[in-house]
Amino acid sequence: MRFNAAQLLLNRTRRRRRRRRNKRKKMTGRAKRKPKSSQDSGTGNGELKKARTDESKAVPLSEVDSEQRDEMVRLYKLQMPEDLYHFWDFCKELCPDSPRGALKDTLGLQLVGPFDILAGAHKNSKNPQPNFHLHWRYLYDPPEFQTILLGSEETQHHIGYFRDTPDSLPAFVGENEAKKSCTITQMGDNVFAAVLSYLLKRRKEKGSKKAEALESLEAKLRDRAEALGLSLEQKTKGMKQRDKKVVTKTFHGAGIVVPVDKNDVGYRELPETDAGLKKILKAIAEARNDEERVKAFGPLQEMITFVQFANDECDYGMGYELGMDLFCYGSHYFHKVIRQLLPMAYSLLKRNVFGEILEAHLSSRSHDNLDQLSAH
């Protein structure tokens, strides 16, 4: 019965695709697929352009040497944007003795992640084998997200880069509060914009407290960003361009980007709304016993069958979306299914580093002990 339902969905999808090919009708339903005019298909293997095309252009090189840059790529397997290195230079000027703590007093932010490498902290690590895929990787952080700043410990607020592919520069800087939800909120296309956005929000909350220090820091941030040609917009032109390529928002809200060709091959929507899927996942996670849980898994198992059909027809985005939604739900009951779906999606999309990050994270997914440089 389940196979017949899957076959029916496959046939319906084929018919829809033929109709779209002929008439280019507007999509309806859960994750509105963009028409070709606004959604550019990816390059050859589905990877995005390697550099962002937005307001932040022709940024001069920072003082960070090539040796440190090479070490960063070796440890993270990711290329860092130039604004990260400029922000390090900026914080060294603010607080030469402790650049990573330069924003602690005024904003309560601590520089971590790649900044730990720039500070040489990894050379004195208490952990003999730190895994930088897991360094400050919070419970809901998808492989696309890389933490660079820590905020409130209470809410596990953190700020990081979000990449659509491992070999592209970040699409934006976002924030998440892991104790509250999986939601990732966009803050700008570079770390200066993100910190300014956070500063302006803090100033409203704090009132007159530290007003002078915040004002001084704001002026310095604006001056440096302007000198470097970095945009301080919270939503740049480049980010708006990316929004047009997002095929679906997913539970974390930041959206996923997959290449979709002129025949609409690359992504097909899930047969459930977000609310419907969450209801299914809730029934599984909160089942009173194993028998109830196995029964509740039925609708999800059916969707996995649909994903297999989608992968056969090169609609890799469907498995990517379902796997990401399961990951964002946060329950360990879905780890086995996530391992079925997401590494396969990343492999088909040629985003293998994200698959490596995911595997490492699922093996050690926690709210605690996130500093890979401390003793484990």
Description of each model-found segment:
Residues 167-221:
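Compact, glycine/acidic-enriched structural inserts
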